[in-house]
Amino acid sequence: MSALRSARYALLLPLAVALTAAAGEIRVTVSVLDAEKNAVPGAGTVVWVVDPAAARRAAPGARPKIASKDKRFDPHVAVVPMGGTVQFPNLDRIYHNVFSLSEKARFDLGLYRNGASRTMSFETPGPVRIYCNIHPQMAAILVVIDGAIWAQAGSDGTAVLGDVPAGKATVRAWDERGGEFTGVVDVPAGGAASLAISLDGSAFRDAGHKNKYGKDYPPPDDDGNQY
């Protein structure tokens, strides 16, 4: 290795170490009030660090999937940074018609068969409720986030946000039952901050949904007669 290259490495190494040391983590605990006003772990709650610029940088490499499988969407909750593209493969041996009437992103991917896939890009942060125009039991939620550091709470309601720059960090959360949360955390360099989030999901009810035409779904029938 040349002396010049060695000097460059010598200059860059302290910088890399300093940047690594400056990052910390946020340990999040989420609880949600259920219909009986009991606090239960917020399993599946999406939490993230707000950083729109980082979201834009991460978007080109973000291509999560929401698959149609066994007349269900898998996963039920997915996450993508704003500007990212989501894949919607059909893994069933029947047709599906993925659509959304959400204000954040209205779209209709049309009918497509087994083995085919469609894609959709999402620009506006917020939850997007996704359905199938043929099968009313199919429902998913895509959470479009304005950040690049995110996690979903486990069955115990805990999540860890890692590699967070030291200093003040704005954290947001979204839960299907309990709605939204925004808070500010002071992240220590090389250390961990704790954040407890309490959400009220006591009023949550699955009210069902209409088809893409805003009408009730027809009675269930054999899939072969649907199209």
Residue ranges and their predicted role:
Residues 9-20:
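Bacterial N-terminal signal peptides
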Residues 4-5, 18, 27:
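A detector of low-complexity, intrinsically disordered, Ser/Thr/Gly/Pro/Ala-rich segments
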Residues 1-11:
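Bacterial N-terminal signal peptides that target proteins for export
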Residues 23-227:
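Extracytoplasmic copper-binding redox domains, predominantly the cupredoxin/blue-copper superfamily
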